[in-house]
Amino acid sequence: MLNAVLAIGAIRLSQLGHCCPPEMLHYSIKQSNIASEALSKVVAEMLENNTVDWKTALLGSIVLLAIEVLHGNEAGALLHFRGGSSILKSLANEGPRMKGAIGPPNYKHSRNSNATSDEFDEVITAFTRLSIEQYPFIGLHSGGSDNAPTLPSFFETLDEVRNSLNSILSSMYAFIRQWGHQSFKILPRHPLPKVVSARLENLQTTFQNWKHKLNIFLFTRIKMAEDHTRAKILLVHYLVAWVKISTTFFADMLVYDNFLSEFGEIVAISEDIINIDNRNRAISKSPCLTLDIAMAQPLFFVARYCRDGSLRRRAINKMESVGSDGIYNGKTVAIIANWIVETEEGDMAGRAVSEEMRLRDVTFDIHPDAKIATVYAGKKNINGTLDVIHKELALH
């Protein structure tokens, strides 16, 4: 693990243009290969002996994922992402298992390690934020920790703005993992338990304070156009988080109608960012998965939850401009988003979707050959229970 982390540092420094001797880069690549082989061997031995340490496997997945991203190896990055996600889904006992799981389908991962340890909240949140659908892993919570976010009196740098938002998002996802299960989706018919209501109000207040401090920072500190674009990206993710935390505990999805202005802002700002990014892409040297996940998530969020047909289609159309090659490119994810919209609208294309037509708990997996995507979703039947929908979509 140490070798892998050292390799990440050396590779990233060389890509940022810092003085990095060739022998250092060669060493880092050599050590990352050693780390990959060693971690793979350890996990294989654990599987063979039925003694999987989920912490080692998860950390190995996230560290090796980072190395593959820096090397531009999308297939390798997705392999590690799917493996880590599979472990978390197995532990949380939530939703369908993704392809590429570590171990056979009927294998139960060892629970010798405490799955609710505070120190692994960040790792679990990382897998949520790396998935396009932002899978919540409900049930894997921090065992009572409030996961207090960081919010300074004022922001001096854009890094401080980003780090503060990241800490608030981490706190939000830990809160949702602990309290976001179906039995607490009772608003507006019933009040939330006091402990949940207090945590919710505290998070909402923190988000609002962050937004206020961001506005001051933009007015007093931002001078360069590039920094203004980076700040816009953070603003989009704030808007998504604000809608998410404000709707988590509602019994039906009609509540999203109260956030049409936020959905509109998300789409409009995302369009500006993507247009700027596409103009600069030819000279960009930044390593990334082929789908620019920072902008794909907000657009997928709008297509998934908004009921306004025109806004949903604007989001899908712009999503097609995000990324052009590889497995998880904008066009393939847009096909999935379009299927969601068409399935919900049925014969009423372009109109607001009725509650009984909404899809729930949507997850998807794009196959390694990038030709087919498997989509899972739930849909309420006349008895109020969820029927599972399983659909395979052709992507070409």
Regions found by a protein language model. Give the residues of each.
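Amphipathic alpha-helical protein-interaction segments enriched in hydrophobic
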Residues: 53-61, 225-248, 284-308, 312-313, ...
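Specific register positions within alpha-helical solenoid repeats of the TPR/Sel1-like families, i.e.
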Residues: 10-14, 69, 132, 243-248, ...
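Alpha-helical solenoid scaffolds that mediate protein-protein interactions
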Residues: 28, 35, 42, 84, ...
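Long, well-ordered mid-to-C-terminal structural blocks that present hydrophobic/aromatic surfaces
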Residues: 197-266
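Structured C-terminal portions of repeat-based eukaryotic scaffold domains
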Residues: 253-302
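Intrinsically disordered, low-complexity acidic/Ser/Thr-rich segments used as protein-protein interaction/activation
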Residues: 3-11, 16-198, 219-231, 285-288
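Alpha-helical solenoid repeat scaffolds, predominantly canonical TPR units
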Residues: 31, 38, 80, 262, ...
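Intrinsically disordered, low-complexity regulatory regions with latent secondary structure
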Residues: 101-162, 209, 320-396
